[in-house]
Amino acid sequence: CAAAYQKEGNKAMHNKGFEKETFKETVRENIKTLYRKTIDEATPQQIFQAVSYAVKDVIIDDWIATQKAYDEADAKTVYYMSMEFLMGRALGNNLINLTAYKEVKEALEEMEIDLNVIEDQEPDAALGNGGLGRLAACFLDSLATLNYPAYGCGIRYRYGMFKQKIKDGYQVEVPDNWLKEGNPFEIRREEYAKEVRFGGNIRFENDPETGKAKFVQENYESVLAIPYDMPIVGYGNHVVNTLRVWDAKAITDFKLDEFDRGNYHKAVEQENLAKLIVDVLYPNDNHYSGKELRLKQQYFFISASLQALLEKYKKKHSDVRKLHEKVIIQMNDTHPTVAVPELMRLLIDQEGLSWEEAWEVTSKTCAYTNHTIMAEALEKWPIDLFSRLLPRIYQIVQEIDRRFLIKVNEMYPGNEHKVKKMAILRDGQVRMANMAIIAGFSVNGVAKLHTDILKTQQLRDFYEMMPEKFNNKTNGITQRRFLAHGNPLLADWITDKIGNGWITDLS
């Protein structure tokens, strides 16, 4: 696929967007078009927007060429599912990976604009919070740099987690309204919107055409998932992958009849309820409503992402039983592990596969990254909440659990300890990590010691039963953002000593 892309890229990417005079003129035109101002009248924030759109114009050509090359090569694609992506600021990182940072800096200096000042106008994308989110962001950067076809899939949080302020020596938490000025690097893709259903009941019937069992969800509530695509630029190779984050919208966002009757709150009630799903990263789950909202968030982005990838796959392939030959679903921690039963649901209820066929596909498609050795941090959901909010998904989880425990009892007859530790459904809870391990073809830790502890202590029973699944992938960070961009003087010194190969290969 990389070779196919390079052939396309060499033809498509003699891009004049970074020729100095052309770039400067584009920035001036963007200021005029966006704000009806001259460059001298524009605020630093407005200049940031204009520069970002000029950079995006260049990225777009690569983006289109990359996706075209992937499509022509029919390349296997990884879908990296994560509750967070701690991306950091996009402008500087994109310029570094386009190998155009110095050129743009010089062009702006000729316009009496300091690129560092402009970069400071960009808020951090509030799509993540900690190491889990930064790992996801670094993986996306590396995948693009190494020419791997990949999508990141997550949620377009409106306020992130929180913005920290210090008042009288104490932390004060306020909403992080990072989208207040808009995000110049994102593209709204309304044409790929997906419906996501919650609650209701499941009715069983026989399909008169096929004679197969059919499960019908009734009396449900649904929201519309709207994708926003952000470019992930590979370093110096003209490859641009995609981070797709989902916004939530009501199916019927405004009820005019309620408004005309004076029921103003009811007129927008459904839209407000939909917005709650994407308002905040990790809402407080110390109460039932918070737990329900978190589970809604997880199913929301997973269901939308899986519907989208299945639709994309079916454009070129008629046999969904071979999905695993073209798709990998990497679950970053336990938050996305509802992907296992959701993929089963789509394959059985929508595509008409048998249980055995669907399980064969799912168990060859899904992989799981574990981030913790603490039992209390391995996500669990109350069965009453899970079954009420996701009734069909719960039925599938029950069947996965039942079939797996038959295998456990066959391998370890009479060993109740094994059953207790390895069951998905136990003590009134749905244990998401157990489900991910049972269904995934790969289970990795993120450091050698961490993985060893998983094998010998925390997940020992699973390791003894299926050792071939376990492996280690030591965490790292991208040297392009944190060294080439973060410390350019040190980066130049290193390059003077050993050349610039370290930018893409630290080995």
Regions found by a protein language model. Name each.
Residues 9-507:
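A conserved ligand/cofactor-binding region detector
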